[in-house]
A protein has these predicted regions:
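Active-site-adjacent helical/loop segments in soluble small-molecule enzymes
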Residues: 56
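Active-site-adjacent substrate-recognition loops and nearby beta-strands
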Residues: 8-19, 35-47
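Residues that recognize and position ribonucleotide moieties
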Residues: 49-50, 75
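Structured segments of extracytoplasmic/periplasmic soluble domains
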Residues: 28-32, 59, 85-88
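C-terminal intramolecular chaperone/auto-processing assembly modules
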Residues: 1-3, 10-22, 63-112
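Parallel beta-helix/beta-solenoid repeats that form elongated, surface-exposed shafts/blades used
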Residues: 48-49, 67
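Periplasmic N-terminal gating module of Gram-negative TonB-dependent outer-membrane receptors
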Residues: 19-31
Length: 112
């Protein structure tokens, strides 16, 4: 059995210490052009849905080039966007609770 030292290190080589602003990424996702397209070698009936790699590279500056979108980058952008949406949803839920309480209080005052 090979030792751990013989195994290639597949982990991140240089993790970033720069924080990611999920709300900024979410805004970038919202502005990213999404279209249907196909590769040149595919039959005309074949369609894919998503951003063009060039737009992706310009928007996020991720990956090796502007001709492909790495799944790891797409997953990361998706997950941080979901986190931002989850946070926004929580804020909106709290606001709805507060507004309902205010409405009940106002309704109670006017029904007296």
């Amino acid at each position: 059995m090979p030792s751990q030292a013989d195994q290639p290190d597949l982990g991140p080589v240089a993790p970033s210490d720069r924080p990611i602003n999920g709300f900024q990424v979410l805004e970038q996702v919202a502005g990213l052009p999404i279209s249907t397209w196909r590769y040149r070698w595919e039959e005309p009936r074949v369609r894919h849905l998503g951003p063009m790699a060039q737009d992706w590279a310009t928007t996020f500056g991720l990956g090796e080039n502007d001709t492909t979108i790495a799944a790891v980058d797409a997953n990361g952008v998706t997950l941080v966007s979901i986190q931002a949406l989850y946070h926004l949803l929580g804020e909106l839920r709290n606001e709805v609770v507060e507004l309902r309480q205010q409405l009940r209080a106002l309704t109670a005052k006017t029904n007296k």
